[in-house]
């Protein structure tokens, strides 16, 4: 028995309590997806910024090149946070 069937049985047999549990699960799942999905980009962007500032302090003549690479790395790192946002929105609005 797969998870979708189990949820459907819970909803149909549980009445209003089943629907409440179902929506509670959707909300908790979306919250956990965004919460955990935001930790990685936050830590990663902090490390990128700290190391870029350290590199610029050591070699000021390379600051333009380092800034470009830092912004590119931050954009790639932030994409995982956006993916978790998409998953949370799917959990909230797309799944029945």
From Swiss-Prot:
GO molecular function terms listed in the Swiss-Prot or TrEMBL record: lipid binding; proton-transporting ATP synthase activity, rotational mechanism
A cellular component annotation (GO) from this entry: proton-transporting ATP synthase complex
Protein localization: Cell inner membrane
Transmembrane region(s): 28-50, 75-95
Alphabetized Gene3D superfamilies for the sequence: F1F0 ATP synthase subunit C
Site (Reversibly protonated during proton transport): 78
Main location: membrane
Alphabetical UniProt keywords: ATP synthesis, Cell inner membrane, Cell membrane, CF(0), Hydrogen ion transport, Ion transport, Lipid-binding, Membrane, Transmembrane, Transmembrane helix, Transport
Pfam family, one: ATP-synt_C
PROSITE patterns linked to this entry: ATPASE_C
Membrane association type: Multi-pass membrane protein
Role noted for this protein: F(1)F(0) ATP synthase produces ATP from ADP in the presence of a proton or sodium gradient. F-type ATPases consist of two structural domains, F(1) containing the extramembraneous catalytic core and F(0) containing the membrane proton channel, linked together by a central stalk and a peripheral stalk. During catalysis, ATP synthesis in the catalytic domain of F(1) is coupled via a rotary mechanism of the central stalk subunits to proton translocation.
Subunit-level organization: F-type ATPases have 2 components, F(1) - the catalytic core - and F(0) - the membrane proton channel. F(1) has five subunits: alpha(3), beta(3), gamma(1), delta(1), epsilon(1). F(0) has three main subunits: a(1), b(2) and c(10-14). The alpha and beta chains form an alternating ring which encloses part of the gamma chain. F(1) is attached to F(0) by a central stalk formed by the gamma and epsilon chains, while a peripheral stalk is formed by the delta and b chains.
Similarity comment text for this entry: Belongs to the ATPase C chain family.
Name the record gives this protein: ATP synthase subunit c
Organism: Petrotoga mobilis (strain DSM 10674 / SJ95)
Taxonomy of the source species: Bacteria, Thermotogati, Thermotogota, Thermotogae, Petrotogales
